[in-house]
Amino acid sequence: MKPRSGLEEAQRRQASDIRVFASSCTMHGLGHIFGPGGLTLRRGLWATAVLLSLAAFLYQVAERVRYYGEFHHKTTLDERESHQLTFPAVTLCNINPLRRSRLTPNDLHWAGTALLGLDPAEHAAYLRALGQPPAPPGFMPSPTFDMAQLYARAGHSLEDMLLDCRYRGQPCGPENFTVIFTRMGQCYTFNSGAHGAELLTTPKGGAGNGLEIMLDVQQEEYLPIWKDMEETPFEVGIRVQIHSQDEPPAIDQLGFGAAPGHQTFVSCQQQQLSFLPPPWGDCNTASLDPDDFDPEPSDPLGSPRPRPSPPYSLIGCRLACESRYVARKCGCRMMHMPGNSPVCSPQQYKDCASPALDAMLRKDTCVCPNPCATTRYAKELSMVRIPSRASARYLARKYNRSESYITENVLVLDIFFEALNYEAVEQKAAYEVSELLGDIGGQMGLFIGASLLTILEILDYLCEVFQDRVLGYFWNRRSAQKRSGNTLLQEELNGHRTHVPHLSLGPRPPTTPCAVTKTLSASHRTCYLVTRL
């Protein structure tokens, strides 16, 4: 640090003077407190007002910061129009899981107890109720049994159920559906987007601009109710779920029913939901591992099918969680569950998998946050009876069935968008950083009449004080030490001069070499001067 002159020192002292700073600071009130003169009542009142305003300002700032730290959010609802909408996936399941005509004695041997609650002694009577002969003498069951193969073979076939199919007036068929296993058995999904298939869209709303299908529920194939079990179906019809292609169906929990003898109109409205991630919300955007989750375990043999990681969904997360839990407890998975574990045998279904899954659902141990973006479909249902008296005979001739069969087995399902718009439900942060800064600035201007530049002025003044009072202290101390050292040196030199004897300019005896006269001084320079003299 260079030495400072007296003028620089005075300017530095003036810059760090609180009175000089208060007279030029833009913060209101400081000039009235630190002005020239002594303590007066007016100055005390100004000091009190400034302190109270400063306390109120700090309280408001702390309150705003606390509110911001709670990370509140708000939900907005907006109705938006679109030129076209992607048609949803539609999953259909017959309420009856297995056809009576396809069950064999081998099926009853392996799965009769687990699925139907039959004792081995009741197999013959049940086969007679199915209209089939009992097992022949010497019947030997197969060494192994696969539940997925049972449902693929004995479940209702879409080729037999689907009487008519049209999408936006154009014909469609079983090839437009994808087989998928759910807890209700073998089901079928329209417009699933599986295997890279292009998703269908619609440019118009209203009936006739969606999916219209006519189905035969095949009541003659329904299994006879032998015992009242927990999952025994007493109804007849089709279970339907309308969902996004990004999530697997949970039709046993979220599906609605369509009854035979009725045409069911389903008016849909698309809802696009957006949730916030932490700390404002708890949504998740991570993709699910295909080893833990495959939303299409539709291979009857249960062989794993490699595919890209599916997007995160709430239903997919729960299925993956349930699959891992059952696999850990039982060493297998239920046929509708994702994963690479082997499909449980009927005995494992009865003894382990079903009880474990029910216990898990009661405890609700799966913690699955909402996805950050998802699509749902609001529905409005209405029904009319079919067939009319005028159409009953025509339909009976067309499908080679009786009029009573048409009334008891045939249904029509019409799914369409209500209008070509959708609802955008979005979570947003209720209090942003910009709002926090705006509130702090407003409180600062209201209570103490300051701004961001005022804070810079205060920081600049504190730097001046630090440089003058702290660094200046060490500089002055160092300068004092230097001055003290110079004084001691000067005194030592002066002391040496006082010990040198008075030299006369008159005649004197011959001088001796410097080695002799060196005793007059310890300095070589002094020795030289004395010798010259």
Swiss-Prot record:
Localisation: Cell membrane; Cytoplasm
Disulfide bonds: C93-C187, C165-C172, C283-C372, C317-C368, C321-C366, C330-C352, C332-C344
Tissues and organs where the protein is expressed, per its UniProt entry: Expressed in sciatic nerve and dorsal root ganglion (at protein level). Expressed in sensory neurons of dorsal root ganglion. Expressed in Golgi interneurons in the granular layer. Also found in superior cervical ganglia, spinal cord and brain stem.
Residues recorded with modification Phosphothreonine: T40
Family: Belongs to the amiloride-sensitive sodium channel (TC 1.A.6) family. ASIC3 subfamily.
Functional summary from the UniProt entry: Forms pH-gated heterotrimeric sodium channels that act as postsynaptic excitatory receptors in the nervous system. Upon extracellular acidification, these channels generate a biphasic current with a fast inactivating and a slow sustained phase. ASIC3 is more sensitive to protons and gates between closed, open, and desensitized states faster than other ASICs. Displays high selectivity for sodium ions but can also permit the permeation of other cations. As a neuronal acid sensor, probably contributes to mechanoreception, acid nociception, and heat nociception.
Protein name, entry field: Acid-sensing ion channel 3
Organism whose genome encodes this protein: Rattus norvegicus (Rat)
Upper taxonomic lineage: Eukaryota, Metazoa, Chordata, Craniata, Vertebrata
